[in-house]
A protein has these predicted regions:
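Short, charged/polar, Gly/Pro-enriched secondary-structure boundary elements
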Residues: 182-186, 212
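Ligand-binding beta-strand-loop-alpha-helix segment within the catalytic cores
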Residues: 68
Length: 228
């Protein structure tokens, strides 16, 4: 893994690695550290995905080399792995740091959010609700930070912060119109999406064919088991 990271970094490629569990996180960070030691690159924005069970010391090392984190906040309330089950397997201390969003933000890491759909509900506002209602109070984040996780931060992680991710003159006009303010609404996950605009034009959903209906049915069957 170190050899791969060193080679890709030398070529100027942005690297993204999955890391679930503290051992996997250790392998991943060690590989990135080896790559940066071989060729320093301040603006690489290399990424770790998931980053479950990372220790604070590991996250400090990630912050030192400016890694970005691609988290999946809906796993915080994933009913396939309830808190009682996780505690029985991992213990309370490790369970509490499964998705350490608060620690990541306090250390200055850039964190983007996703759903890992269809494993969890593919709805950004649902993820935002999970982020601000983490069962461990120390790992909860502010609504504004959670909003950035689904807007500006992913754009930065893909080197597109000058094109998308915020509503500003000159940016690509991809945005949604919401029925309420996610920074103040009582039920973030329940906010209705009133409209979707792509490149400044209102998007109208086309009639779904048989394949689309089947895909939606499968996703609904998978995801309805884990809704909070």
């Amino acid at each position: 893994m170190n050899e791969f990271a060193i080679g890709a970094n030398r070529e100027g490629w942005q690297i993204t690695m999955h890391a679930i569990g503290d051992a996997a996180v250790e392998q991943c960070i060690t590989a990135y550290e080896a790559a940066y030691a071989d060729k320093p690159w301040d603006d690489a924005r290399h990424v770790m995905i998931h980053v479950c069970l990372a220790s604070e010391e590991q996250l400090k090392r990630a912050a030192k080399i400016k890694l970005c984190i691609a988290a999946q906040s809906p796993f915080i309330y994933w009913k396939q792995e309830p808190d009682e089950y996780l505690c029985s397997v991992l213990g309370r201390e490790r369970t509490d740091r499964l998705n350490a969003l608060g620690t990541m933000h306090r250390l200055g890491l850039v964190v983007g959010d996703g759903s890992d759909g269809p494993c969890t509900r593919p709805k950004p506002l649902y993820g935002m609700a999970c982020s601000v209602n983490h069962p461990n109070p120390d790992e909860r984040i502010s609504r504004l930070d959670a909003l950035r996780m689904i807007t500006a931060n992913p754009a930065y992680m893909s080197h597109e912060e000058n094109k998308r991710g915020t509503l500003a003159p000159g940016m690509i006009a991809d945005f949604v119109v919401l029925g309420d303010d996610p920074l103040t609404a009582e039920d973030i996950a329940g906010i209705e999406v009133k409209a979707l605009y792509l490149h400044g034009k209102k998007h109208v959903a086309k009639k779904t064919g048989v394949a689309g209906l089947l895909a939606r049915a499968i996703i609904k069957r998978i995801t309805q088991r884990e809704y909070i």
